[in-house]
Amino acid sequence: MRKLVLLLAAALALTACTAAPEVSSPAEAAPPAETAAIGEAAAAFPVGTLQMSIPQVMDTGTASVEITFTGLETEPILKLDYAAGVQTKLCDIDLSRQIPVAIMQHGDTVEYFWDSEGSTVFAHTAIRPDGSVEEQTIPEKFYPNFYDEYAAYDIWGTACTRLDWQTGELTTASLPFVQLDSVLGAVGSRVLLTRIVSDTPLPQGEGNEEMLDAVLQNSLREYDLYDPATNTIEKVFDEPYYPEDRNEIKSYLGYCGDKLYFGVTCTDGASALSRKNTLVSYDRTAGTWQEECSAEGEDVCGFWPFSLDGQLKLVVLWRTKDTLTLYSIDNGARYEVPYEEAQSSGADATGNKNFPVALTEDGRILVTDGYVYRNGVAASRYALIDLGAYLAGSREYTAVEMWTE
């Protein structure tokens, strides 16, 4: 079963890097993006600003919604209103029969998608602003990974399946290509994905690993923008499926304007520990790569991207035990911010302070501020602070009123 991982509440434990090809250097710039779209246009429907969804948390810029996990069969869905600085309970969910798939929002309604009974039952629960809750089953497998104000979308494998918020209608279109490799994120009203371009179809099944590897050695990984409204793709760039330097790994972090941002990590081949992190961007209009910022050290480290209204704004480039290195997309400046690393997660948990969690529409940033305990399990306590003050090293927080039973 395909599941997306928690990106927000577990930020302290994440390393956002995944193995991928090497990025071309600025001197070896790729050609500008092709403008020709591939695929047969389907009947168009409205598509807004797409957001990628994950199983346990959602952020809108004005609020965040998350599922807590304390080991009980019944757990709450909590909403944190940034303007009020208060976290409240929306409803309880039954984890004894529900496996979280995604949380998303349209208008003022929060939608919680889940499956059950060995992935044979698929459903979503609508949580209305008046507090009412409505559970609706879905007639076929549906694991949505994107949403906008009009619909939820399951884009994977060979198809794009769309669930209309107003009508509840489920429609499916075959993707206009084969050999989907990965789905990376939303870029406005389109989805950035990669597909494998090879001279021969990829060998399938057990026992064909060597043959598959041989085909991939001579294949390309092509980055495309997929438009779910018209069921077409536009090529952005391609590169060898396997990088020349196997000790480099790359992860897509987000977009801002015409630029796509990637984090590139150089690792120690023996220990796989990161030695240097570099933030690079690809300009879709010019077709050129640019190195934005880099940092190096001796600690294990990944990238943590933070977006607002869908666009990348801030990146944690490096993390030591007591200092974060951040890079601002807006002004190109680099900042060193103190923080306290999380220590343990039980009753004796300490630290977990001043790590960024989310950006808010009113110019603040949500950060960790120690712990709150629910059913004896430690969960992050939050606080809010002006973004400029945070980057300057201030800790003049406004504490969030956390929900507890």
Question: Residue ranges of each PLM-predicted region?
Answer:
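C-terminal motif of bacterial Sec signal peptides marking the signal peptidase cleavage site
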Residues: 14-16
